[in-house]
Every structure is written in structure tokens, then in C-alpha cells.
Amino acid sequence: MKFRVVVMMEVLAGIAFFGFNSASVAAEWESTLAAAKKEGKVAVLTDVTATLRDALTLEFQKNYGITVELFGSSGREVAPRVAAERKAGQFLWDIYIHGSTTALEAMIPMGAFDPLEPALILADVKDPKTWRGGAIEFLDPSKMVLVMTPFHRGTIFYNTKLVDAKEFKSHKDLLNPKWKGKMVVDDPRRAGPGVATFTFFYLHPELGADFIRALGKQQLTILRDYAQEVDAVGQGRYPVLIGTADFVAITRARQGVPIAIVDARQLKEGTDLSPTNGNLALFNRAPNPNAAKVYINWLLSKDGQTIFARANGYVSARLDVPTDHTEPWRVPLPGAIKTYTKAAMQVKDNLQPLLQEVFGSQ
């Protein structure tokens, strides 16, 4: 009898605790939302296309009546911009939605971010069971940069009118003499998808440095603008493109441009796992701290992640977000090579000298 009483008391205590906790969360959310509406806006620094702009602004503004001021900038431009602003005493941004390399190698060392975890309020956002792997993934030990969209990237892009995708069963097929002088590559000596692709090549046991050297002999045309890279292939000036931004190629394909991505499942080596520009961080000294919290929790909700993933053709780290909008090969596989972690980026000490050897100095 005593045992039953004790158990019942524990159950009631648990119900009371969770009820209190739920009420506490609701109160915190309402308080934050009220303060956010007084601020009236949130400033977001990101990569941007028209589709992504709509995804990151329209639904949030409709739901909360808070204006989203969005500025699109490439990863290579973000750090110099923010550094110059801060040197001048300007703290203009609330939210960072961008790449891993820029975050780890520039923004965090600059001291630009606050830890993100304290900004998470909504229960389903904080619940580890919501996320792939049973936990929210962060890039760094201080939990400043949250990984929203880990997925298998494209590495080989091609003009569908000029190339049969079946020609590629391995990345080594890029070494076929028929492609010599006919391929574009995103500059791997700078931050971006190009260096992520070559990091994958370098880390893969069946590719490595020898493959990179051989690829360098294929007279690649090096570009530094994603749109120019994709358009060069889409317009038929080059049949093949290596390592560009997936979201730009996807956007062009939706517009009817004849560009596609080789299915990673048909490539012997597969492709790497990366969130590309799907990382989320909170700027410190944010001008609209409450609106930033509301935006973060909305973006990490099921609705926010569904909109974001669909706009980019990405796969969300949330398990309850559908993946029917993208190719099945995008969904993360166990054991895939991650090119966005600190450990992966540390190989650059060896990779960058190799790239300078192969492609010359910038």
C-alpha cells in the first residue's frame, strides 16, 4: 500500500512539475513575443535567392507582424563586412544563416556570436527527440552555431542537353580526357562549396591528393560566383561543373534551365554531408534581441524548417519535416564524410598548400 502511495505521489509530482514547466515556457514565450513586437523587426544576414528570401520573410511576418530585414551576401563577403561594421561601432545584425567555414574560421574567432541554446524556448524545438541523431547538432563546443540542414550535397553538376548522367559512376570519371578544358569549378581556395567538395575529395580514401592533382590537369575553369558558375553550364558554355552551391542550381532548374545534379547513389564514393548555408547563429549585441529569439524559434519549428528546406531543396535536421520535396539521395546516411566540422576543416593545413600547388595562388 505504501508503495502505491509513493508511486502515486511521484506521478502527481511529475504532472505538477511538467504543468508548471509548460506554464513557465508559455509565459516566457508570450513575454518574449510582446517585447519582440515592440522592437518591430529582425535583421537577418544570409545567402539569398528570390525563393529563399520569400521563405525567410513572408510566413514569419504574416504570423508575428514583425518585419524581417534580409540582406544577402556570399560567405566570402560576410566576415569582412561584419568586422568593418563592428570596428566602426555598428552592430546591425540579429541572425546569421550561412555557411560553416565562415562561421568556424571567421565569425566565432571574431567573437560575433552568443551561445544559441539559451535562445531556444519552444518545447518541441528543445526536445532532443525532434532531431536526427537524438540531439541538436552544433558546430562548436560553445553551441553558438546550430546545424539546421545536414544533407548530401551535389558534387557534379551537368547540362542535361549535353551530358548523360550515366557517364558518371565515380568521381574518377571526371578524369576522362573528353572533359579536358570543358569543366567549371567553384574556386576551392576560398570559403564555399568548392573547398567543401575538395575537402571531400581529400578525405575520401579512394580519392585523396593524387585524384586532386590529376583533376587539376583537366584544365578547369575556376570561377568565384555561384550564379556565373551555374549559368555557364545552364547556357551550354561548359557541360560540367564541380562543387557549386546546390541551392543556386536547384533554383535555376526550377526555372527551366537545363542543369541537374548527379545522383550521389550512382557515384562509387557517394558525396559529403554538409548543411551548406543552413547554419543558424545569434549575433551578440543584437539590436533586436527579442525579435531574434522569436525568429530563431519559428525557424527551428516544424513549419519554419519545412518552409526553409523546401525553398532550398535541403533536408532538415528535424525528423518530422518531410523530405518529399527533394531527391532521396539527399537524406543523411550513417558514416558519411562530414566536410563542415572543425575536424574536417583542420585538414586545410594540408589541403590548401595542395590546392595552391594544383591551381596556383589566388
Task: Describe these PLM feature segments.
Residues 322-362:
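Extracellular/periplasmic bilobal clamshell ligand-binding domains
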Residues 43-57, 69-83, 91-230, 234-237, ...:
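Extracytoplasmic ligand-binding site segments that recognize negatively charged/polar headgroups
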Residues 155-162, 199-203, 275-288, 307-308:
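A bilobed periplasmic-binding-protein/Venus flytrap-type ligand-binding module shared by bacterial periplasmic
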Residues 25-43, 61-62, 175-181:
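Immediate post-signal peptide segment of exported/extracytoplasmic ligand-binding proteins
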Residues 103-106, 239-260:
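A ligand-binding cleft/hinge motif common to bilobed small-molecule-binding domains
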Residues 278-339:
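Mature extracytoplasmic/periplasmic domains
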Residues 212-216, 221-223, 256-284:
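Periplasmic-binding protein-like
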Residues 8-20:
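Bacterial N-terminal signal peptides
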